[in-house]
Every structure is written in C-alpha cells, then in structure tokens.
C-alpha cells in the first residue's frame, strides 16, 4: 500500500511540475522582437459591430484548461503579452516617436472595412455612463484615442495644424470624438480627483464629445488587432456612419498626413450622400 501511495505521489508531483512548466513557458519565451514600422494595407477592426452590454472575453475558462488546443493557443497569447511589457512599449515609442505604423494610401472600402469596438464610459459633461457607438451611429466621426499627455498632444495634431493654421474641431463634415483611455483603477481614481482641472483645460463645447473610458474593456489581444496597445502613442480612427473603420493613423502628423486624413473625411462625406 505504501508503494502504491509513493507512486501516486510521484505521479501527482510530476503532473504538477508539467502543468506548472506549461504555464511558465510564456514567461520563459518572453523575448520581445524589435518593432518594425509598416504601412497599413489590410483593414483594421473587428468582425462584428459594437452593441450595448457586450463584454469582450480574454483568456480561458476553467474547462478550457483541459482542452489542449485552447491551452496552447492561450500560451501563445501570453507569450506575446509578456514580451510587450511597459519597458518594451516605452523603448518602441522612443524609437519610433509614436509612429508605430504608417497610414494606408487611401481609405478602406465599405465592403472590406471592419468595425470599431464597443466602448462605454462617461463624458466630461455628464456623470451618466453611455455607449460610445451610440454617438457614432449615423455620422462620420474622427476619433482620437490616447492614454497619456504625449498621446493626447500628438494625436491632436491631426485635428489642429498650427503650421497650416487649421482647426477642424468644428468641421461640418464630421464630428470629432476624444477618447481618454484610463489605464487602471489608480488612474481612474486620480482622474476623479482632478476632473475639474481636466474640464478647465478642455473647451466647454468639447465636453459632450470628450469620453473617459476604461482601457481594460478591450483585452490585450484585441488591442493588438486594433493596433492601439502602445499606451504612450496617440491614435486616430475615421469611422463611417455604419461604425466601420475606414482609415487609421498614429503618432505625430505632418502637413501631408493631416491633409490626407481630411481628404478621406471629405470623400466619406460624399459617399454618405
């Protein structure tokens, strides 16, 4: 009986070690690859349109732990997540100056374009929670997404170009939406304390379209698909009335990039008619 117990103990211990080693694999393999700046060719976005109360899932359920294929897939996902740490993001931002990719040559056609994700949050004008897609539906929208002051600054260059002397915040062809991503609970708490200060820095007429949304609503791998994972940069989406992403940009904007984006907005306005 003692021999049987010892054998079972050895088996249990070896299984635990194998199980643990399996899930430590992402940490061991977390060697980041150097970021390569490429021009966008394929549409960016999600396959399904946003809808209220949708919750994007991340990771495996308890039952999935016993599914070999799903577990291996999750391990690969974790390898990517561990590799792209905060230090990696900072180094990449410094190397690229926030220009993580180059905008497409032209906008994506409606039948090929993918959807903007569901996001909920509050605006500067109201404490009530709402869904961002509700204000996007039926309109052409230029959306700024940022989490930091530097991301806010460089993404604003696509709206206001001091070199050209143009301010498109009041452009009649579209609406401009600001989405300030709150990274975590600490930042959310700090924002509550400094909300009045933030309101004073944003023109009152912009408060209705300035959203505060928790970044964690969109899981890591979904942010990878949307190309918005680097917290230091700022991003621009052009979204059509059907909630599809038709154009995207990031990082600082040159005069040519500024003009390209607003040319796209003009073309989509004609398409709408």
Curated annotation (Swiss-Prot):
Keyword Phosphoprotein (UniProt): no
| Highest taxon, organism lineage | Eukaryota
Q: Tell where it localizes.
A: Mitochondrion inner membrane
GO cellular component entries = mitochondrial inner membrane
Biological process (GO) annotations?
mitochondrial proton-transporting ATP synthase complex assembly
Query: Where is it mostly found?
Result: mitochondrion
Q: Which keywords appear in this protein's UniProt record, sorted alphabetically?
A: Membrane, Mitochondrion, Mitochondrion inner membrane
* Classification via PANTHER family: MITOCHONDRIAL ATPASE COMPLEX SUBUNIT ATP10
Q: What is this protein called?
A: Mitochondrial ATPase complex subunit ATP10
* Species in which this protein is naturally found: Candida glabrata (strain ATCC 2001 / BCRC 20586 / JCM 3761 / NBRC 0622 / NRRL Y-65 / CBS 138) (Yeast)
């Amino acid at each position: 009986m003692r021999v049987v117990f010892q054998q079972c103990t050895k088996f249990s211990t070896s299984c635990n070690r194998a199980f643990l080693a399996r899930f430590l694999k992402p940490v061991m393999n977390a060697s980041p690859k150097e970021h390569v700046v490429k021009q966008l060719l394929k549409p960016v976005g999600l396959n399904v349109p946003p809808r209220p109360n949708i919750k994007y899932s991340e990771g495996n359920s308890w039952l999935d732990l016993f599914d070999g294929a799903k577990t291996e897939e999750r391990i690969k996902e974790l390898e990517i997540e561990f590799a792209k740490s905060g230090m990696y993001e900072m180094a990449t931002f410094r190397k690229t100056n926030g220009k993580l990719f180059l905008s497409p040559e032209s906008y994506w056609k409606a039948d090929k374009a993918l959807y903007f994700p569901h996001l909920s949050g509050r605006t500067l004008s109201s404490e009530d929670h709402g869904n961002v897609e509700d204000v996007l539906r039926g309109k052409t929208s230029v959306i700024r997404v940022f989490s930091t002051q530097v991301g806010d600054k460089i993404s604003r260059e696509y709206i206001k170009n001091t070199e050209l002397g143009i301010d498109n915040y009041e452009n009649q062809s579209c609406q401009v939406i600001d989405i300030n991503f709150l990274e975590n609970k600490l930042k959310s708490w700090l924002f509550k304390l400094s909300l009045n200060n933030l309101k004073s820095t944003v023109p009152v007429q912009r408060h209705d379209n300035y959203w505060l949304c928790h970044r964690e609503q969109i899981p890591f791998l979904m942010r990878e698909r949307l190309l918005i994972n680097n917290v230091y940069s700022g991003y621009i989406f052009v979204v059509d009335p059907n909630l599809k992403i038709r154009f995207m940009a990031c990082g600082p904007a040159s005069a040519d990039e500024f003009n390209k984006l607003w040319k796209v907005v003009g073309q989509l306005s004609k398409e709408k008619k």
